[in-house]
């Protein structure tokens, strides 16, 4: 969330003339911030195109990733350019009405992004816990409903200030700052970060526990499977009783075990990668949401 205040740090009722812009500082900031914005826009577009252009990526999990990219793309293309201009000029140059809309879109995109990570963590928990039943549990219809809920909840959290849930705005229109109304600050902090964060942490703790248990079970199953195969081979070599039925059964069990092992390995790897991404994301957001309710 990019809420900045202008040169005037108070909520004075008089309009202050904007301070002169330092050209060298403005150029440096423009290059750095512009580069970051372009990098963010292109990166998220590439994610969306890679999923759209490869049919084998048309799965619910990848739809969640596209949703995350869409939220970040909206943020980088509609919010950050005005934030960059705000930072370069040192004051808000777009008027009070647009300030309120800009702030609401900022909250909408950031909340949708964080809730998108929450949905991904739930998806990874189901994938690791139920790798064989995953396609029947996480259907396309349920996935789309989850994404619809993400954006609906994000919209509810973001539009409060537009309907008056904020402190009186300063008359100086060069000031655009975060609403400090205590009720909304607490509501948005809980809904946008702390509740999703709690769900994410619980889900990844469960993923860790299940992955550890499944890894132990699969290793044990692998040893048993090898032992059974050796026994069958030994019986055939010694020309004991016919073992055709046992061989077929053993082959079926081995195939089922191999499929389960492959699916679990994929889900575990995906969960580990996304866990690192989510962890970095949470660490980046945590300072802001720790200071926000206090400030």
UniProtKB/Swiss-Prot annotation:
Keywords, ordered alphabetically: Cell membrane, Cytoplasm, Disulfide bond, G-protein coupled receptor, Glycoprotein, Membrane, Nucleus, Phosphoprotein, Receptor, Transducer, Transmembrane, Transmembrane helix
Primary localization class, coarse: nucleus
Compartments, as annotated in UniProt: Nucleus membrane; Cell membrane; Cytoplasm; Membrane, Caveola
A GO cellular component annotation in the UniProt record: plasma membrane
Residue ranges that the UniProt entry lists as topological domain Cytoplasmic: 52-64, 123-143, 206-273
Transmembrane segments: 28-51, 65-88, 100-122, 144-167, 182-205, 274-295
All ranges on the Extracellular side of the membrane: 1-27, 89-99, 168-181
GO biological process, one term: regulation of vasoconstriction
Modified residues (Phosphoserine): 215
Cysteines engaged in disulfide bonds, as pairs: 99-176
Membrane topology, as annotated: Multi-pass membrane protein
A Gene Ontology molecular function term of the record: protein heterodimerization activity
Coiled-coil regions listed in the entry: none
Subunit description: Homo- and heterooligomer. Heterooligomerizes with ADRA1B homooligomers in cardiac myocytes. Interacts with CAVIN4.
Family: Belongs to the G-protein coupled receptor 1 family. Adrenergic receptor subfamily. ADRA1A sub-subfamily.
Function, in words: This alpha-adrenergic receptor mediates its action by association with G proteins that activate a phosphatidylinositol-calcium second messenger system. Its effect is mediated by G(q) and G(11) proteins. Nuclear ADRA1A-ADRA1B heterooligomers regulate phenylephrine (PE)-stimulated ERK signaling in cardiac myocytes.
Protein name: Alpha-1A adrenergic receptor
Lineage, broadest ranks: Eukaryota, Metazoa, Chordata, Craniata, Vertebrata
Gene: ADRA1A
